[in-house]
Amino acid sequence: MFTINAEVRKEQGKGASRRLRAANKFPAIIYGGEAAPVAIELDHDKLWNMQDKAEFYGEVVTLVIDGKEEKVKVQAVQRHAFKPKLTHIDFVRA
């Protein structure tokens, strides 16, 4: 099972997302279930190594956000067109 540390995003929008990517992070979102959607930021290098494994896409992933654990599944992954970079991930609550 995969465990990922995440932080709630303080800023949203194109400029904020670009600043995140420049800081070696990238935006993501958690949605589904009864709770409201949550915009988060993730560390790029840690996720890049995890996303190479097929199990990352099929198993339940644990996100640790501000000390609380949230069980999610990967719904969609967006990658840069020609650079080895993740640009966004959608998670759905499990």
UniProtKB/Swiss-Prot annotation:
GO MF term list: 5S rRNA binding; structural constituent of ribosome
Keywords of the record: Ribonucleoprotein, Ribosomal protein, RNA-binding, rRNA-binding
Xref: InterPro entries: Rbsml_bL25/Gln-tRNA_synth_N (IPR020056), Ribosomal_bL25/Gln-tRNA_synth (IPR011035), Ribosomal_bL25_short (IPR020055), Ribosomal_L25_dom (IPR029751), Ribosomal_uL5_bac-type (IPR020930)
Record has rRNA-binding as a keyword: yes
Functional note: This is one of the proteins that binds to the 5S RNA in the ribosome where it forms part of the central protuberance.
Entry's family note: Belongs to the bacterial ribosomal protein bL25 family.
Protein name in the entry: Large ribosomal subunit protein bL25
Annotated organism of origin: Klebsiella pneumoniae (strain 342)
